């Protein structure tokens, strides 16, 4: 199936160098170099480095703060009160991949006392592991989506898109296209999953901001095309609503790799 996808991709229009505002490729390369200099074997980025890399490509992220103490968590929550005054707290330690499965997330926290109790709970249960917590405002309602990148040993980076949240592994409803994406590719990618009608709505009345969603996928594609060291990226969930899209949780893994030209349509 991937061979057929690649043949169609090569037969399609040339992949344009899409004019995306706010792309800082050189800064992104510096972020990657600094990380790999410190971690020669690669690995999963810590929250601050991950957010820094995403900001190089203008990828919209929910506001957040890092806290290593109970008092810092309370101060962060005070600054970041979200929907109905609530916040979310997520534990972090190197190697933590599935926070929900590890029960390392507290939702719907109100007031200082609940924030303190949540921090103490995480600190107690993950003693010796936890290096700190991420505090975020509780996001308003929307459709939870998945966007990501994986590397194929033969074809290079693939951009993934589909239904996100806790339903990701259960429903396995996602599609993939080779990076870099064209305008045509990104439209196909959004409409390919079985759940696409949830986004497109009845009679063409979209329930999310499709233009912002396309921008997110194009920016992710650009990051994959720029950075051969990008072994894996997982944005889940991405909250999509009529007012825009926002990445609520992101994981990025880097590996040392040789640069390569991803714009292979030039060679056909």
Label for each model-derived stretch:
Residues 1-268:
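ATP-dependent carboxylate/acyl-activation modules
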């Amino acid at each position: 199936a991937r061979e057929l996808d690649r043949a169609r991709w090569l037969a399609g229009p040339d992949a344009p160098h899409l004019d995306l505002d706010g792309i800082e490729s050189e800064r992104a390369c510096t972020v990657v170099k600094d990380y790999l200099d410190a971690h020669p074997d690669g690995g999963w980025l810590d929250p601050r480095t991950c957010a820094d890399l995403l900001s190089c490509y203008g990828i919209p992220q929910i506001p957040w703060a890092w806290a290593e103490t109970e008092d810092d968590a309370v101060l962060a929550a005070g600054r970041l009160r979200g929907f109905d005054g609530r916040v979310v707290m997520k534990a972090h330690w190197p190697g933590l991949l599935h926070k929900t499965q590890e029960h390392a997330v507290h939702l719907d926290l109100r007031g200082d006392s609940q924030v303190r109790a949540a921090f103490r709970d995480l600190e107690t249960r993950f003693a010796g592991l936890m290096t700190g917590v991420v505090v975020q405002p509780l996001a308003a309602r929307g459709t939870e989506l998945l966007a990501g990148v994986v590397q194929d040993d033969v074809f290079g980076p693939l951009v993934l898109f589909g239904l996100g949240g806790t339903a990701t592994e259960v429903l396995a409803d996602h599609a993939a296209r080779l990076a870099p994406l064209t305008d045509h590719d990104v439209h196909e990618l959004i409409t390919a999953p079985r759940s696409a009608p949830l986004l497109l709505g009845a009679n063409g009345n979209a329930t999310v901001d499709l233009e912002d969603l396309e921008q997110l996928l194009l920016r992710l594609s650009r990051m994959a095309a720029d950075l051969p060291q990008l072994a894996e990226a997982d944005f889940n969930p991405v909250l999509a609503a009529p007012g825009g899209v926002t990445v609520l949780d992101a994981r990025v893994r880097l590996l040392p790799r040789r640069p390569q030209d991803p714009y292979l349509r030039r060679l056909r």
